[in-house]
A protein has these predicted regions:
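A short, small-residue-rich loop immediately preceding and capping a beta-strand
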Residues: 66-75, 99
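A short, polar/charged loop-to-alpha-helix boundary motif
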Residues: 45-58, 175-181
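A structural motif shared across PLP-dependent enzymes of the aminotransferase-like
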Residues: 20-23, 27, 48-50
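Zinc-dependent deaminase
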Residues: 1-21, 38, 63, 82-193
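Acidic, glycine-enriched active-site microenvironments
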Residues: 2, 23-28, 67-69
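Local cysteine-cluster metal-coordination motifs and their immediate loop/turn environment
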Residues: 43, 50-54, 71-90
Length: 193
């Protein structure tokens, strides 16, 4: 595994920590590296709260180390003012040397604008590092912005003879414990059931 991929794996681990708290925003993690050492980490923790890049920058003990550092983030830094200021501007302000991204943000408010802003400021940008893993992590976000519909999971349990309930409507589990655990996990990840 390449060095960029190793740090991106860590970004994705951090991003997962936002599960259940950031929707409809995507799950995003950020790792800041200087001279081969991680100097800062962060993730988007709560909808409406600071983005991963802000939390990572704030975790750096000596912000002078940010100049020339490499920032790993699984989704393109935003370039618009929403509930928070643009993350691309923050990275430019701190004169980072390079930004490594898993996925371009397909939200029409961003959609490559963050990358353009970084490049225009002279920051090197590497894209598509572990892009498939990034898309899988944020498949709900990408489905919403690319297909203008929610991500859909169909869960169905039936007996071997095709029924979904007993003839007297008495309650009885059809699915097994393992299946119920998977469904419980799905429900914790979705915005509606």
């Amino acid at each position: 595994m390449l060095q960029d991929e190793l740090y991106m794996v860590r970004c994705l681990e951090l991003a997962r920590l936002g599960t259940g708290s950031v929707s409809p925003n995507p799950r995003v993690g950020c790792v800041i590296v200087k001279d081969g050492k991680i100097i800062g980490e962060g993730w988007h923790q709560k909808y409406g709260g600071p983005h991963a890049e802000v939390n990572a920058v704030n975790s750096v003990a000596d912000t002078s180390q940010l100049e020339g550092s490499v920032v790993y983030v699984n989704l393109e830094p935003c370039a618009h003012v929403g509930k928070t200021p643009p993350c691309a501007d923050l990275l430019i302000k701190h004169k980072v040397g390079k930004v490594v991204i898993a996925n371009t943000d397909t939200n029409s408010l961003v959609s490559g604008k963050g990358i353009e802003k970084l490049k225009a400021a002279g920051i090197e940008v590497t894209q598509n590092v572990l892009a498939q893993l990034g898309r899988e992590l944020n498949k709900r976000f990408f489905t919403f912005h690319e297909k203008q519909r929610p991500y859909i999971i169909l869960k169905w349990a039936q007996t071997l003879d095709g029924f979904v309930a007993r003839s007297n409507y008495e309650s009885k589990w059809i699915s097994n414990e393992q299946s119920r655990q998977v469904v419980h996990k799905w429900r914790s990840e979705e915005d509606a059931v």
